[in-house]
């Protein structure tokens, strides 16, 4: 789905999903990872808060004749009692949440084996000169280190690695 990217290739390789495994892709968007994962594993649960994104996943699902994809219309703040557990959890670029502790609890309750999270390493997605040009403060987002520190405080020793994107930034 979409154009090939180094980020996508590196993340899929790192995940090393096996044919007998299930995957929960949280914040799946249009199916960037859902489709290639469904082609290599037992089942994929595609979770997104946007019905429009899930509609796109449905279109790709039909186009590629993949019957092992289940769509879940949820957000991080919803009740996840009916979200199935999966061997592998992926939350790619979808970890900027209001309640980090709730997110971590949901990940822990749904993951059977492994969790892959990606987060920004830069405080924002725009060039710093943009903020100066428009006369606004460069406030930005919390970076990956906030997430790593919170995991550590909860006794989770995350294995952290970086993927350089086409823009030269790391994720």
Specify the residue positions occupied by each region the protein language model found.
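Conserved class I S-adenosyl-L-methionine
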Residues: 1-16, 20-29
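A short SAM/SAH-binding and catalytic strip from SAM-dependent methyltransferases
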Residues: 87-101
